[in-house]
Regions:
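A short, charged/proline- and glycine-enriched loop
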Residues: 1-2, 188
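Glycine-rich beta-alpha loop elements in corrinoid/cobalamin-binding modules
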Residues: 2, 18, 25, 32-169
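Nucleotide-activated donor-dependent transferases that construct or modify glycoconjugates
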Residues: 2-11
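Short hydrophobic "strand-cap" motifs at the C-terminus of beta-strands
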Residues: 6, 89-92, 195-196
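Tryptophan-centric aromatic hotspots in well-structured domains and transmembrane helices
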Residues: 12, 66, 96, 101, ...
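Short N-terminal binding/cap micro-motifs at the start of the first secondary-structure element
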Residues: 12-18
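A short local loop/turn or secondary-structure capping micro-motif enriched for an aromatic residue
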Residues: 13, 170-175
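Radical SAM [4Fe-4S] cluster-binding motif and immediate context
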Residues: 174-205
């Protein structure tokens, strides 16, 4: 199974911590996960072509205020050329009202809400354990039942109903692996690293 984590950054010098952290935490699926980073200055057809050539079995987008319009347009175009490839999204721009995002965007399979490292790994396990390497084979109903057990998801089920699996408890930061494999690959770029998450005053983010 080939999984593509996609980030559209504001500038070329930026990197997306979220996708690197998801890959680092993906466990036995790590070698199946590829990261693709673009910028909002890339032509949308250029990004679409690059993604299509990679032939992902599953694609996930990291969504922020600066890229959400571009991401949603890309998802619509991607389905026109690639068919029914599962598309998942995450990030602050979609997780605060995931149900509304799914209602407005039929091309999105589901939203990963909150801290995504464990959620993403368990999501991949649902796909791999149900379908193996071929997402066109396997017991579809069994897949949806498995998915309902993964905390931190809001998704469109087989009958088009929207299912929310509930919040995942905060992760212990000390348990998360270092997200960057090769720091030399980030020469002349800005990288980000978290030492804490959330707000001590219980702000919504």
């Amino acid at each position: 199974m080939k999984i593509l984590l996609t980030a559209i950054n504001a500038k070329y010098i930026h990197s997306n911590l979220a996708v690197y952290s998801l890959k680092a935490s993906s466990g036995r699926y790590r070698d199946d996960v590829e990261i693709a980073e673009y910028t909002i200055n890339n032509y949308i057809d250029e990004i679409l072509s690059s993604i299509y050539i990679k032939k992902p079995d599953l694609i996930a987008f990291s969504c922020y205020i600066w890229n959400i319009d571009m991401v949603l347009e890309l998802i619509d175009l991607f389905h026109k050329v690639a068919g029914d490839v599962p598309v998942w999204v995450g990030g602050p721009e979609v997780s605060y009202d995931a149900r509304a995002v799914l209602e407005k965007n039929p091309g999105i399979t589901g939203v990963m809400c909150g801290e995504g490292e464990a959620t993403f790994r368990e999501l991949l396990a649902c796909y791999e354990e149900t379908f193996g390497g071929d997402l066109r084979a396997g017991n579809v109903m069994d897949f949806w039942k498995r998915l309902e057990q993964v905390q931190g998801l809001v998704f469109r089920s087989w009958d088009q109903t929207i299912v929310a699996t509930g919040e995942r408890p905060p992760l212990a930061m000390d348990d998360l692996p270092f997200p960057y494999e090769d720091l030399k690959a980030f020469d002349h770029k800005i990288i980000y690293y978290e030492t804490s998450r959330g707000c001590p005053f219980s702000c919504s983010y």
